[in-house]
Amino acid sequence: MSSMEERMELGVAAAPGSSSSGLGVGPVGGALDAGPGSAGLAGIQEESGVRRDGSVGEADPDAPPKKRVRLQEGEAGKLEERLYSVLCCTVCLDLPKASVYQCTNGHLMCAGCFIHLLADSRLKEEQATCPNCRCEISKSLCCRNLAVEKAVSELPSECSYCLKQFPRSGLDRHQTEECQDRVTQCKYKRIGCPWQGPFHELSAHEAECCHPSKTGMELMGILDEMDQSHRRELQLYNSIFSLLCFEKIGFTEVQFRPYRTDDFITRLYYETPRFTVLNQTWVLKARVNDSERNPNLSCKRTLAFQLILKSKVNSALECSFLLLKGPYEDIKIKPVIQHHVFSNDANETEYAPLPICDSVECNKLLAAKNINLRLFIFQIQK
């Protein structure tokens, strides 16, 4: 069968029901003159983007551009998510806030977790190892990864006030100096104005603030309250300085890790691994909203902690202790001195509130993978 006959059969097959008389055959090598039945073949060719001359058709210029833009934005978002998983710490699975260390095989650790691993190994009297590949790690074997530190500093992070995206390296400056929605206080706070609000409302408030026009007698009562608060704060710091003069002082970095109870309705609680301070073994526990049934339904969030002595003691052990933020954390926590006499029968303190500023700070702690704090214990000699 000749090539001409093959073309005719192809045209008939593409247009069933059409007679052969409906097809006009041109010169050899020319195109088939399409009859009524060949419109389907042309339509198929046009839909598939293949022209009759064999070239591939371009994308439809009338396609809505918004869809293409959204696709690109989605791809960028996925790239950021992938970078988060690639650059995160292998221990806490969070992005590093300060220095980044790597083991000899290249696994990344944030400075807080790296120091914590070395401290744990010292307490257990064993060699510290990378949690991923189990190779030995130490300050001499591990080195900083400056490329990762710079990459992490350029990743976008959300401002907690205006909810806009900024590079992590410039986020602190934006939130403290530039953001128009950052929380600020009235300049007349010194004479008792309690106003707090967004920065863009500060000028309007100060123009209407009533405290500058108050009489001296009215201001005296306000200043007395402020003096009492100042005296309490000064007394706290004097007490801390007195404790620092004790003979037996111990401190360590502790890491609260989240767990769930075995109840039918599980409750969130935190517990630290066992640690040694003043030659005794201890554990810290923490609970949310005093273990209420549904803390997720409450807008007010609190954390309370207790210190537990795990060692057996021959005599009563009287101690003062306090919790502060860890060396690489940005938690706003106020020091509060706790006191307890430990014995074999009374080895647990009462739950005391973790002295954080407000529910916003508590939510930051709950959102983190782990809570890193520093514990000081002062043994009182009799």
Swiss-Prot record:
The keyword Nucleotide-binding is assigned to this record: no
GO molecular function terms listed in the Swiss-Prot or TrEMBL record: zinc ion binding
UniProt protein name: Zinc finger TRAF-type-containing protein 1
Cellular localization per UniProt: Cytoplasm; Cytoplasm, Perinuclear region
Family: Belongs to the ZFTRAF1 family.
TM segment ranges: none
Zn finger (RING-type) location: 89-134
InterPro entries, per the entry: Sina-like_RING (IPR049548), ZFTRAF1 (IPR039338), Znf_RING (IPR001841), Znf_RING/FYVE/PHD (IPR013083)
Region Disordered, residue ranges: 1-72
Xref: CDD domains: CYHR1_C (cd22861), RING-HC_CYHR1 (cd16505)
Zn finger intervals (TRAF-type): 147-203
Lineage, uppermost ranks: Eukaryota, Metazoa, Chordata, Craniata, Vertebrata
Keywords: Cytoplasm, Metal-binding, Zinc, Zinc-finger
One cellular-component annotation, GO: perinuclear region of cytoplasm
Domain of life: Eukaryota
Gene: zftraf1
Pfam families in the cross-refs: Sina_RING (PF21362)
Compositional bias of kind Low complexity: 10-22
UniProt main location, coarse: cytoplasm
